[in-house]
């Protein structure tokens, strides 16, 4: 019996490209997955190389407009987020290669999360609070830091990532520092 193919979505945002520690962690992960014999499909977004723009009001308004009521310009503005959402929904495993810059995420990675954290798409509001819509997925965070921050008050990145992933219903989270 053959193993089912694992659909892996990898997002990375190292300012130092192949010289960055988070990129090295991601490369090691992919190499280990290849060596495991597990069939997989990998979609990788280098958010720095892609030059992902920051979210603006026009783009957010485009998503808030029902798809069948969007103007041509709104459809164009929503296409980037809609594409990221389709990839995330299709993924079995989300791998986040996250360097720590100035106690937080790179702005490019925050811009990606801004586009996938969408009410009605990855979570919904209820009378008891938000409920994630992406249950059953796993997340692996490969966190690179220039110092010892994990488990200290200075680590604002880990709780931020846990909250964003949890908001979407991705509660099976693993962090490697």
What residues fall within each predicted segment?
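A structural motif corresponding to the C-terminal end of an alpha-helix
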Residues: 87-92, 137, 168-173
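Short, glycine-/small-residue-rich phosphate/pyrophosphate-handling segment
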Residues: 125-170
